[in-house]
Regions:
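N-terminal [4Fe-4S]-dependent radical SAM core
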Residues: 3-4, 152, 157-198
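Conserved SAM/AdoMet-binding glycine-rich loop
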Residues: 4-11, 67, 94, 98, ...
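Glycine- and acidic-residue-enriched helix-capping/strand-helix junction motifs
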Residues: 17-30
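Flexible loop/turn segments at secondary-structure boundaries
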Residues: 17-19, 173, 207-208, 218-220, ...
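Generic structural signal for well-ordered alpha-helices
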Residues: 34, 60, 81-85, 137, ...
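Glycine-rich beta-alpha loop elements in corrinoid/cobalamin-binding modules
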Residues: 36-168
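Residue-level signal for the nucleotide or nucleotide-sugar donor/cofactor binding architecture
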Residues: 128, 224, 259
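Canonical Radical SAM [4Fe-4S] cluster-binding loop centered on the CxxxCxxC motif
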Residues: 190-227
Length: 306
């Protein structure tokens, strides 16, 4: 008997209008989650990535999703909830709804508030989405009738009036285990639409600022392999060599804090000189503005004078 593949929708929804359509970034976040999930369950899943509400809903009418995962931020809450209502109207409870992202708080009392506020959501994923979401997909594939019988790692849900919470894995996923969504072509459709590229070389922030959502994160600062980072820069540059006006964004919490950062900056500058892209790099510098952070700016040279 041939089993049907699990249809998974991953959504990083954004308000798209005439003011924002030229400021859209590729959905790197769900790209990583999708790439990691594909790596583990390649022959058992079909994964679709979405940034546009209308594109997602159009696809949902022709392909019934089994799981829809949303990148949840407070600013896109209404968009997410609108799509959840539309999905429920189409397929009732025959679709699993998952919320994950930086606005999912790690405090237990906040968990209760989220469960009360969003009763249509089946599961909330904490921390790094790859671990919690893939653990959930493994449960759906292995025991589809008993998905919520036991806790799920890095996640919490509501069952019989109680909060059921899995083990906290924190920000500890070895980044060598995470495939590149760029190099696997998963983000090509967004690059083709001139979405701004977003590149991540490291994860975690060592600072505990009260005003920042990352201040409560627990884990280890880790770096992606330098070879992968350089290959991604090359890949993105080839896509955008004829579009030098598109801003290159670094998804670094503190660019200039890690010892590899000056090398990345130097590689960006050389790529700009040889390929013609990028001509504008946007990033957040190390908050302490150390010598290494200054070295990063020196290494970039005149790249931002385009």
């Amino acid at each position: 008997m041939i089993m049907r593949k699990l249809e998974i929708f991953l959504a990083d929804l954004f308000y798209i209008n005439r003011l924002t359509k030229y400021r859209l970034c590729v959905p790197l976040n769900i790209g990583y989650v999708g790439a990691y999930t594909r790596k583990l369950f390649d022959n058992e899943v079909n994964i679709h990535l979405f940034k546009d509400v209308n594109v997602l809903l159009g696809k949902a009418k022709s392909v019934k999703p089994d799981v829809v995962g949303f990148s949840f931020y407070y600013w896109n809450t209404n968009l997410n909830c609108f799509v959840v209502r539309q999905i429920r109207a189409l397929y009732k409870d025959d679709v699993r709804i998952v919320f994950g992202g930086p606005s999912i708080d790690s405090i237990n009392e906040e968990h209760r508030k989220l469960l009360v506020r969003f009763p249509e959501v089946d599961l909330f994923v904490e921390g790094e989405g790859e671990i919690g979401f893939s653990s959930f997909i493994e449960r759906v594939l292995s025991t589809p009738d008993k998905v919520f019988e036991d806790p799920i790692d890095s996640s919490f849900f509501h069952e019989d009036g109680e909060i059921v919470k899995g083990s906290e894995t924190g920000f500890t996923l070895p980044l060598t285990d995470v495939p590149s969504p760029y190099l696997n072509g998963y983000l090509d459709e967004f690059l083709a639409r001139s979405y701004m590229p977003l590149l991540q070389a490291t994860r975690m922030c060592p600072y505990t600022c009260n005003f920042c959502v990352s201040g409560k994160d627990k884990g280890v600062v880790r770096a992606f392999p330098m070879d992968t980072v350089k290959e991604e820069i090359d890949y993105i540059a080839r896509w955008n060599k004829d579009n030098p006006h598109i801003i290159f964004n670094l998804a670094e919490l503190n660019f200039g804090i890690n010892k590899q950062d000056p090398e990345i900056a130097e590689y960006l500058r050389k790529t700009s000189e040889t390929v013609g892209y990028p001509k504008s790099v946007y990033f957040y510098s190390d908050k302490r503005f150390t010598k290494r952070a200054r070295d990063v700016i020196d290494a970039l040279g005149d790249i931002n004078r385009y």
